[in-house]
């Protein structure tokens, strides 16, 4: 499945939730939906990340693709920006590490300039929320559906 298809699945889920969330009066139930959305978001990011790495490796060499698929089989949400750089991209060499860092920095600067928020902080927060909800059944106060 192309990595973009994973995002379409999440977009469909969010479209459904947009219609439902305003009808929920119970803050506890609303927080449960937010927690499940955080889990879904990180799952989508993880699947997309796996697809990008595996597709790249398969284009390079079939055996590298097999190795990469096995390597990424159990990353289980370990997809923070630092982990992507240090545990995953670094294995492919400095050229790709620099390219990733440049791309992330350009995106971060553009979003900060146009939206006034950090895409990296937002991304990291979603992972934190997912971990809190998945492992402890609770969400930080900073996590809301809005």
Residue ranges: model-predicted function:
Residues 1-36:
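Charged alpha-helical initiation segments
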Residues 144-146:
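Short, intrinsically disordered, charge-balanced linker/junction segments flanking boundaries
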Residues 60-142:
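Flexible secondary-structure boundary motifs
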Residues 31-57:
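Short, hydrophobic, well-ordered secondary-structure elements
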Residues 22-26, 53, 57, 138, ...:
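Short, flexible helix-adjacent loops and helix caps
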Residues 14-21, 48, 130, 134-137:
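A structural signal for well-ordered alpha-helices, especially hydrophobic packing surfaces
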Residues 8-11, 15, 39, 43, ...:
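Generic structural signal for well-ordered, non-transmembrane alpha-helical segments
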Residues 15, 50-68:
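Short hydrophobic interaction/assembly module
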């Amino acid at each position: 499945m192309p990595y973009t298809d994973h995002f379409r699945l999440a977009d469909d889920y969010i479209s459904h939730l947009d219609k439902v969330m305003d009808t929920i009066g119970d803050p506890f139930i609303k927080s449960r939906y937010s927690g499940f959305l955080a889990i879904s978001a990180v799952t989508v990011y993880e699947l997309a990340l796996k697809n990008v790495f595996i597709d790249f490796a398969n284009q390079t060499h079939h055996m590298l693709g097999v190795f990469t698929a096995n390597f990424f089989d159990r990353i289980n949400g370990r997809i923070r920006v630092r982990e992507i750089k240090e545990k995953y991209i670094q294995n492919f060499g400095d050229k790709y590490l620099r390219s990733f860092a440049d791309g992330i920095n350009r995106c971060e600067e553009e979003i900060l300039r146009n939206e006034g928020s950090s895409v990296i902080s937002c991304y990291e927060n979603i992972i934190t929320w997912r971990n809190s909800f998945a492992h402890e059944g609770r969400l930080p106060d900073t996590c809301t559906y809005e």
